[in-house]
């Protein structure tokens, strides 16, 4: 048997296994996805999922818990899709900028109320809770109540939670967790 024939036979077997695996996955449910870790790209990865949902004709909701007036090109791009994307920036800035726990707790509570409202709205297929992990890390929200709300969310709703230091309870409840690891970042290469 030639190398090309061996390769073809190997790939035919692999295809049969893959096809069987895909065929066995018949349950459609919404996923709870967590993007965490010290690396960059957690929010950007979530916004990539938003593009996939928009491409399928679904509506996406975004609630930003921390970033405040932080401007992003991702927001500019997603807002070009009109009412397919509803964006709420609820935070008042990074916690080291506000330095006011009471204000941060109030902002996180407002953001969580908006998130719950959007999660209950069947018009949305995906809700992105950007930097919610930060609000949970500093106990601005009741972790048990948040996890319970995610566990009891309506069928078919996908929820993505981003931010560093995801709580173990949230990780345990999630269907998919990605830990972004910083290997190299261009900002560390700039010498001022």
Where are these regions (language model features)?
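Structural recognition of the conserved hydrophobic beta-strand(s) that form the central parallel beta-sheet
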Residues: 158-163
């Amino acid at each position: 048997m030639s190398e090309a024939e061996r390769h073809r036979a190997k790939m035919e077997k692999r295809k049969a296994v893959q096809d069987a695996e895909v065929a066995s996955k018949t349950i459609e449910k919404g996923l709870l996805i967590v993007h965490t870790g010290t690396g960059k790209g957690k929010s950007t990865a979530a916004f990539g999922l938003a593009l996939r949902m928009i491409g399928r004709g679904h509506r996406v909701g975004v609630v930003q818990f921390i970033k405040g007036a932080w401007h992003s090109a991702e927001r500019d791009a997603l807002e070009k899709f009109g009412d397919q994307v509803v964006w709420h920036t609820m935070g008042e800035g990074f916690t080291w900028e506000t330095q006011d726990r009471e204000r941060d707790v109030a902002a996180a509570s407002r953001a969580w109320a908006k998130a719950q409202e959007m999660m209950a709205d069947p018009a949305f297929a995906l809700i992105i809770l950007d930097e919610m992990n930060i609000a949970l890390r500093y106990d601005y929200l009741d972790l048990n109540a948040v996890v319970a709300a995610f566990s009891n969310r309506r069928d078919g709703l996908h929820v993505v939670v981003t931010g560093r230091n995801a709580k173990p309870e949230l990780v345990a409840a999630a269907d998919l967790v990605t830990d972004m690891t910083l290997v190299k970042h261009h900002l560390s290469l700039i010498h001022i």
